[in-house]
Amino acid sequence: GLSLESFIRNALVQRTGSHVKLWEFKKQLQKAMEVLQMDPSYAERDLNVGFSGGEKKKSEILQLMMLKPSLAILDETDSGLDVDAVRLASEGIHVYQQENPDSSLLIITHSTKILESLHVDYTHVMVNGHIIATGDASLIEQINREGYEQFKEQM
């Protein structure tokens, strides 16, 4: 199979059009894995083979951190994660934001926990396929205080 490390390295070559020196790539990969508290042995494992749900989510954040896309859509990245894993995923996303300030993220979630340490420019609330509220990070605080019911009533 294809190892996680090989997958990311090949994807990086495809994305950038240039080869990164192996030692430099491994150093960057190790640094990103440390942020996510991933054991270095995960880099050698076959991509998504035998990974738990949490390990797959960490792998996705690792790919985000390494490939540095200008736009990323994170759909339910926090789904099924325990509190510690959500914190680590959020930290990885935060590091990505800091290192790529001109990038854009669309984070789809039912829980606001993953958003707490991130810089949020816009918040949209969607009910039944319709955006019914838009605001800044203060909208997240309002949701945490008052819940989603207030928005469902607007439909």
Where in this protein do the model-derived segments appear?
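ABC-family P-loop ATPase nucleotide-binding domains
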Residues: 1-70
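Walker B catalytic motif
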Residues: 73-77, 84
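Short loop immediately C-terminal to the Walker-B catalytic DE motif
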Residues: 78-80, 112
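Conserved D-loop-proximal element of ABC-family nucleotide-binding domains
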Residues: 82-87, 134
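Helical segment within the ABC ATPase nucleotide-binding domain
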Residues: 86-101
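Conserved H-loop
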Residues: 101-121
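Conserved beta-strand-loop-alpha-helix hinge in the C-terminal portion
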Residues: 122, 126, 130-153
